Amino acid sequence: MISWIRTLGALLLLASVAQAQFQFFEHMFGNGGHQQQRSQNVPSDSARYQSMWDSAQCDKYLCPGTLACVHFPHHCPCPHPDVEEKVELGEGSAVCVSRGGYRQGEASRKIELARKGLL
């Protein structure tokens, strides 16, 4: 009688382990065919940008990165002002650099030091 109970217990243990295995593989391979739709990345399409460029109303300089209308190219704003800092390099040119976690003005200070050969 005790061997019969042990056998039944072993079978129940095996069945529960097998159930757990199948649930693992079901989730791993797409939930048994019930996969959720994920949004896909938008493919690169220059026609969309070109149409926005063509429809922009500007009689001065149209910034290529932001489509802002400004008087001079070095007045163009950075595309991501909350994480980028605009640094004017002189001769009417400017670049946008990532702050990289530095405080305000630190990125421009590092660029200036690099231009002087001190960094």
From Swiss-Prot:
Residues 1-20 form the signal peptide. InterPro entries: LCL2 (IPR034543). Keywords: Signal. It comes from the Eukaryota. GO terms for biological process: ERAD pathway. Probable component of the endoplasmic reticulum-associated degradation (ERAD) pathway. PANTHER family: LONG CHRONOLOGICAL LIFESPAN PROTEIN 2. Belongs to the LCL2 family. This is Long chronological lifespan protein 2. It comes from Aspergillus terreus (strain NIH 2624 / FGSC A1156). The lineage of its organism: Eukaryota, Fungi, Dikarya, Ascomycota, Pezizomycotina. The gene is lcl2.
